[in-house]
Amino acid sequence: MTVLSLSQECLFDKRNQRSVLHVIFEGSMRVGFCNTCCKRWFFAFDGTECQNSNIEARLRGSKSFSGMEYRHVRLEGYCAHSAGQVSVELWVEDCTGHRRASAIPFTLVNVNPRITVEEMTITEI
């Protein structure tokens, strides 16, 4: 069973039909209280993952919590999307092929996280 949850969301007004969205997440993530679990963080746009490239990060859990063991992550990529208001979302789910831990895995994305969204033309990339 995959558990999917929305971690962060922001609205962006994309003006040009031919441009792409450049998205960056910078922050600390952790999966804990398990040694077989794995979590996948990914960007979605209006509830759908980017069709031309996945923008994702995967972290495996550690068996025990031993203090502030967060990993700094920079998750970055580009996605083509139609013009208009876009909901840019950071989601987290179980990795495919990994069973859930008997205890609830600890996932944290609130240690000074930052999402940056900018509209770019193909020539700017």
Outline where the language-model segments fall.
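Extracellular jelly-roll beta-sandwich "head" domains, especially the C-terminal globular C1q domain
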Residues: 1-125
